[in-house]
Amino acid sequence: LGIPNGGILVALGVALALEAEFNLIVSRKIPLPLSPEGGFGAVTDDGTTILNEDMVKRFNLSPQQITYQVSRVRSDIRQRSLLYHRDRPPSRVKGRTVLMVDDGLASGYTMMAAVESIRGRQPREIIVAVPVASATALPKVEKVADRVISCVAGFGPEFYVSDFYRYWHEPSDDEVLQCFKEWGLRHRPNIEMLGKIPQKDTDTR
């Protein structure tokens, strides 16, 4: 399961390499009111919400400010979910191993919310896999996931996922949809068989 937008391109590569089922979960940062580049938590497409209480206290955010920012993110998520899931039902994860992928972990809250959301659907195991993660995000995500795999850990005082990529851009919605078309073309026989075979021992990656 990739987290759009950036995580979808990484997840596609992983899914193709492992010949795994490919899908997504929408999880978005809750931006700070006067500093949208920063965040104080995350929300997923099923409403799962995790707040960064340290940031809430640091910026003295009121309940009204929190509610307003969360409602704005949920509105954006609804639109994205309609776009991304229009021809793609959610994957069946109960009793299965789920590999959750993003382009990196900065604060970790976007992934934490996604993990908590999927946990409620009773998977056998949740593995988080990312190319890079900040040293502060890793222990937070390790508390909610069964395993965390990161190729690189960043220990600097300032951490930006984009700094670890030679070529970086935020994929458009069209690019996200194109990833699913590419996976579908390569795995059409597998897609047709999903409804015909038992899913217990088939991993969702």
Model-derived segments and spans:
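PRPP-associated nucleotide enzymes
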Residues: L1-R205
